[in-house]
Amino acid sequence: MDYIVVGTAGHVDHGKTVLVKALTGVDTDRLKEEKERGISIELGFAPLTLPSGRQLGLVDVPGHERFIRQMLAGVGGMDLVMLVVAADEGVMPQTREHLAIIDLLQIKKGIIVITKIDLVEADWLELVREEVRQAVKGTVLEDAPLVEVSALTGEGIAELREQLDALAAVTPPRPAAGRVRLPIDRVFSVTGFGTVVTGTLWSGTIKVGDELEVQPEGLKTRARNLQVHGRTVKEARAGQRVAVNLAGIETEAVHRGSSLLTPGFLTPTYRLDASFKLLNGARPLANRDRVHFYLGTSEALGRVVLLDRDELNGGEEALIQLLMEKPVVASREDRFILRSYSPMETIGGGIIIDPVPPKHRRFQPEVLVSLQRRLEGSPEKILAQIIQEHREGLDWQEAATRASLSLEETRKLLQSMAAAGQVTLLRVENDLYAISTERYQAWWQAVTRALEEFHSRYPLRPGLAREELRSRYFSRLPARVYQALLEEWSREGRLQLAANTVALAGFTPSFSETQKKLLKDLEDKYRVSRWQPPSFKEVAGSFNLDPSELEELLHYLVREGVLVKINDEFYWHRQALGEAREVIKNLASTGPFGLAEARDALGSSRKYVLPLLEYLDQVKFTRRVGDKRVVVGN
């Protein structure tokens, strides 16, 4: 079954709470202060079963101007709205402000309800009806049905239920199969259970035992118990009013305005890119003006950066970047409201384009074009642009979040885009990583050039060190993605991978006849020299070799296991080194030994033995203890 949330809106004391009670039998005024003053201060909630059996959740919002923040916390989760106007007063200031908010948030399904019709004459009611129609002209409620009721006598209540039923039937349900998003509007503690949060489930399904997180606090938790309208349930679906008992979190750590989410779904941010409309009649908005920001149940102070102008006038729209004073979570296409810093008045609203953008400089044509494309583009075009702008690629689930698409829709779009050659999908640890095909091909061209140059310059080496290649071209790429990229090119037959090196497919070290003879002569020289090997400089002189050429030959012999590099000056033949280790091991069997004793045992000199012992210390074969050494390895 699909669940729809219906909310009230309208001026204080216009009968919203009484209307909800007439529809549902539930008095949503729950605070003592509300009972005494006769006005709603906090949000009220009640379930409603319609004639068709369809389930609605009714949200009763405060009408008093001082409680507009509570109203904003409730209106964000509405699928339908009832704009309530009292027949004895007509359209009032908060009627107009609530209507402006509904219009800015684009809550397109709604009903206009004129209440208290038992208090007025027919001709007066006709005037109020006309006044209301004039007020909603040009807004999302311009063509909304109008129902006249009396909660006291019950007149019109049955018709209102039928109208709600008809509207609910054509209202798209919220996505129950997606990721969980529940903006929190209440936090409290229940003895024996602990922390409980409540809110309207915007998307997804929560089941008892599900792992969740609270953002922007970054708290990990689990759904211990669930209630929907006071009934304990095993799962709650999008569109329902839910109370979630959270495991492992103190009540003081969670706040109204936070969001309960599928782990990794939304990222806290201090910046938001958006399109914003300033209301007609609002004072001009200057660059970096301070404002109150409202999205879902969250409220934050921030500043508006006008990206294409210095001042925004009433009725105008502009691309902006919001700089928040505390972290918030948002998704693309979320709608928000701004109120002026002082006096606090609703000045406009807009839509999120990028929930985690980089910092922008103003008056940058490429930034403005990019944001406009994202604002107007199809899901596929938006997804393609997001991937294009992420030069190092991004995880497909992150792409879904940034594009405000379901995981299922994102996967289908990516597969279609990959088949069309727009995107390359890389398998990374049983997941998908999306890279623009243009970028993927540019990477391969850069790697090809680098390896061709390396093989030409160092024909004796098996390949370029993996980490060196990464530092040159892929330093910003996560290690797991870089590894997957190399493995993909290896599977495609483009590269050959060794433990620490990478080479072009088919490459093998090549030698000239002269080099082959030099390699044999070098091996012989080090084998014969045994425990008194020549220095690097001596070898270069005796073979008349350039130092860089000699270094390449010696490195090759080291890689082949013929020689061992002791330090920058000395190389030892592996056989000679093994024999020396046995001599040292026998020497140490009688106790710690010094440099002179090792020198005598090897029949060599300090010039050769000291570097040898320092090397053996490095490889953990020996350990120095004062002026002596002991053997600690095999």
Curated annotation (Swiss-Prot):
Residues 38-42 are annotated as: G2. PROSITE patterns: G_TR_1, G_TR_2. GO terms for molecular function: GTP binding; GTPase activity; RNA binding; translation elongation factor activity. It is found in: Cytoplasm. Its main location: cytoplasm. Residues 115-118 are annotated as: G4. The keyword Nucleotide-binding applies. Residues 1-173 form the tr-type G domain. GTP binds at residues 10-17, 60-64, 115-118. Pfam families: Beta-barrel_SelB, GTP_EFTU, GTP_EFTU_D2, SelB-wing_1, SelB-wing_2, SelB-wing_3. Disulfide bonds: none annotated. It comes from the Bacteria. Keywords: Cytoplasm, GTP-binding, Nucleotide-binding, Protein biosynthesis. CDD domains: SelB, SelB_II, selB_III. Translation factor necessary for the incorporation of selenocysteine into proteins. It probably replaces EF-Tu for the insertion of selenocysteine directed by the UGA codon. SelB binds GTP and GDP. This is Selenocysteine-specific elongation factor.
